């Protein structure tokens, strides 16, 4: 069944999206360096007391408000030790926060209202650089952008990293953040770490705080626990990374139809070191990233300034968000698909923000140094302009507001999973335009890691971004299709969710998927026997106490539960809990009109 738009609105779709996107692109190009950076995620009523913490999107998956009695901003390791010691002596709960707080999940939250937040905002210095050993030691609040720049100063490069440079070193390690590669040690930043300094609660004899220096050669078990720690072992103070000599990359994007994508996805990562994909399933297309290492003396001064990470006019963002809300209200599938086609084709035509010389794009391949090609995020490093412009998801304005469902499928099962998604598209070709409005499904390669809470095998990471309503009880257009994909991944293929993204249901029983959990929990018990750095959320996802799912009316609409009865959806708005269309074990919130159509198609 195809949902049709209302005549008065739908007839304007193409012209509307062309107009809006022209404004959007102009603002992106013109205002790249004139933006308002994000505010501190911690806000306090008086000084550093009576505080709340949120993420950069302004809402956690359950929309709860996370409170703390105080926030501390240590500027040195000595100050950090003093903060941890005082809190340990008082038996206070603690959690670490970062400069921008990009984790969607509640990893920054402490329990109750009496806890302490420890911000690494000012632990942002380079400690030492050893060009001969090719190592760089930084404090945990250093951003990826700083890390890349510091390494480049001495002719070194981090080989793989996330594409967004606003993450901190500590944050990347806390959640297992990664780029895309099957080569070398893989794409996870933590697998290029050689030493970790971490401050944990201590005994009376320790002065209530203990500093440990962890290395793979001397403390392998503790080291592998700390590499992806969810922040439950203490506060990482410093990290030493093993780098590589600077190199260049040669990159081109190629768009193809997705007829053979299941086979290509399995093998493409071994052909290109930095390969990834942007899949547009409703359009039947895939954008292949052909991205390879070349010699540092190869001609080229290319730059990646990814367009969706640039500053944008707040007024344009508000119009785009309002249009999406209108499309949801009128169930305007045609409008979403028209917008998705325009956005994705324009991004491809503008090479996603690649330029050959930092100014203009003249053609492929784009060749540039690793520090100029691996990550971006220019909306962060700019002057305050009173929110005339901002990062596209800035919660202080009417901006993007979305869910992110991100998981890793074992490479051996990727073809089958892709075919399952294609089967859903065959049932309703417009169903996944809702993903393409947010640039499609980003797919990145990951490898197995010795980190206890790292990836278990070679896999493809699927990143789905899609509309989230401001009203938690508002159902979404085609939400049953997205929910079914989510459940196919998590339950049929046993996918591993990204620790820093996802909705609650992705973490239901997740810890059973990791074979080294007992070893991790043993280190956790040794480092923090009182659980001062743990929270209700970390206890739930680690399987220690409680459950991540929240059962209440409407809980399935925001992924707080998998529906088991109609009340978990929105029955008064015509959405009922029903089996999946391809994966019959799934339970999804389906609109009544769609149920009758699907049933008729099955006969």
UniProtKB/Swiss-Prot annotation:
EC code(s) of this entry: 1.1.3.8
Pathway: Cofactor biosynthesis; L-ascorbate biosynthesis
Function: May be involved in the biosynthesis of ascorbic acid.
GO cellular component, one term: membrane
InterPro entries (alphabetical): ALO_C, FAD-bd_PCMH, FAD-bd_PCMH-like_sf, FAD-bd_PCMH_sub1, FAD-bd_PCMH_sub2, FAD-linked_Oxidoreductases_BP, GULLO2-like_C, GULO_Plant
Domain FAD-binding PCMH-type span(s) in chain numbering: 64-246
Cofactor(s) it depends on: FAD
Pfam family, one: ALO
GO molecular function, one term: FAD binding
UniProt keyword list: Ascorbate biosynthesis, FAD, Flavoprotein, Oxidoreductase, Signal
Disulfide bridge positions per record: none
Keyword Transferase among record annotations: no
UniProt record similarity statement: Belongs to the oxygen-dependent FAD-linked oxidoreductase family.
Name of this chain's protein: Probable L-gulonolactone oxidase 6
